[in-house]
């Protein structure tokens, strides 16, 4: 929501929308298939990504479901079931940092930082040909999801929490 993020005001004052910048999010992973990140935005796309442990950029089934200009890479240090608070101290790392079905906190954080936004019709805000610097708060008021502060930035996602929780034990590995 732009009223909270003030992205439009930032773009107006600085002229910067994240172009040429990459941001790393160390959290629960990223749903890179979401329309907010230029992905297909469908349940089927998400399930396909969720069922893979391969690098999403090289997995032929998954790579076509994401925007390679937005998603630059990442790694899953935790695995879906890792949660030391619940007695599972054994991470099961893999190359796919997809945000699991347990909460999507990492996806939310990434959206606030650098999501494209999602228009009222469900399409990615990346499809707006006017460019972010020309948008006003009124333009994006009807969107389902407002753009993040740096919508033209790329993302690296590092999953350090399991799908249902965890501790900060794996953060240093991701850094």
Per-segment meaning from a language model:
Residues 1-9:
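Autoinhibitory N-terminal propeptides
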Residues 11-168:
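Subtilisin-like serine protease catalytic core
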Residues 171:
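Aromatic/hydrophobic pocket-lining residues that form the small-molecule binding cavity
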